[in-house]
Amino acid sequence: AQTCGDTSAGFKPFIAEMKQEAAAQGVSKRSIAVLDTVKYDAAIIKRDRGQSIFSDSFLTFQKKMISNYRLQHGKDLVQKHKATFDRIQKQYGVPAPVIVAFWALETDFGATTGDFNTIQALATLAWDCRRPEKFRPQLIASLQLLDIGDLTLEEVRGFWAGEIQKAFEI
């Protein structure tokens, strides 16, 4: 098992590096200052490394995660918000069923939310050597969301893997 990221050793210099990277990408000093509040969270690393669902076969995963309710409710939401999904597909190229599938799997259509500080979670995951290329950009993006006003610091709550649970109006 990998041991990188198992301790906070080196986390503060890493945060200093991320602050420089955020500044280079145009993030405001106000949003960058949020990084001064984050701490290494060993519980995040433990959860990340303990995801047993990724060792399941597809059939086992399907039985656990796909239900008639999710399929029908997903179809209903695609119809209900058709104009919004059409606009998203036109602008970003992502079809409605893909978005709705993630919505279902990640939050059961918003029914479940987390209460983790997602910036702290993303910083911890970005520090871990296993997938920094995934989490460093997400950490910067979360600071950018603060900058443009799509989120407030109080709203940057969600699941341990950094998913932000803001209920957006669609």
Where are these regions (language model features)?
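Mature N-terminal segment immediately following signal peptide/propeptide cleavage
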Residues: 7-33
